[in-house]
C-alpha cells in the first residue's frame, strides 16, 4: 500500500511539472519577439561601443598622430607597432603604424592614452575577413577608416559622448 501512495505522488509531481512547463511555453508564445534577424535588422549600438580602429586627420587633411608612441606603450596585447621619423620642420610623424587585430583585445587604452585623439575605435563591428593577413591593419587602412567615420566621431564629440 505504501508503495502505491509513493508511486501516486511521483506521478502527480511529474504531471504537475509537465503541465507547468506547457503553460510557460504557451505564455511565451504570445509575448512580443525580442530576436532580431541580424543581417537584415541591427540593434542599437552604445555610444561608447569599441569597434574597428581608425586614425583621424585634422580638418586640413594632415594626420593627427604625432608619433609619441603612448598607444604602443600602453597596449596590453602589444598589438600596435609604430615607427617614426623627424620631419624637416622638427615635428615627428609616423612612417609605419600597424595594428594586429588578431591580438587586439579592444580595451580602449590606446585611445585613452592618445593626447591628440588620433587613434579611435569606431562604430564598425562587421569586418570579417577570409585570411589572417587582412587583419593586419597598416597606416593607410587606418587612415581610410578614419575618413569613413569622421562624421560619426565629430557627432559624438559635439554631443559630448566620448568614444571610450
Curated annotation (Swiss-Prot):
Keyword ATP-binding included in the entry's annotation = no
Q: Which GO terms describe its biological process?
A: aerobic respiration
List residues binding [4Fe-4S] cluster 2.
75, 104, 107, 110
What is the UniProt remark on how the cofactor binds and its stoichiometry? Answer: Binds 2 [4Fe-4S] clusters per subunit.
Q: Where is the 4Fe-4S ferredoxin-type domain?
A: 56-85, 95-124
Q: What is its main location?
A: membrane
One GO cellular component term of this record is: plasma membrane
Q: What is its EC number?
A: 7.1.1.-
Say which domain of life the source belongs to: Bacteria
- Which PROSITE patterns would you find in this protein's record? 4FE4S_FER_1 (PS00198), 4FE4S_FER_2 (PS51379)
Q: Per the entry, which co-factors are needed? A: [4Fe-4S] cluster
What's a Pfam family in this record?
A: Fer4_7
Q: Can you state the subunit structure given in the record?
A: NDH-1 is composed of 14 different subunits. Subunits NuoA, H, J, K, L, M, N constitute the membrane sector of the complex.
What is the official name of this protein in its record?
NADH-quinone oxidoreductase subunit I
* GN (gene name): nuoI
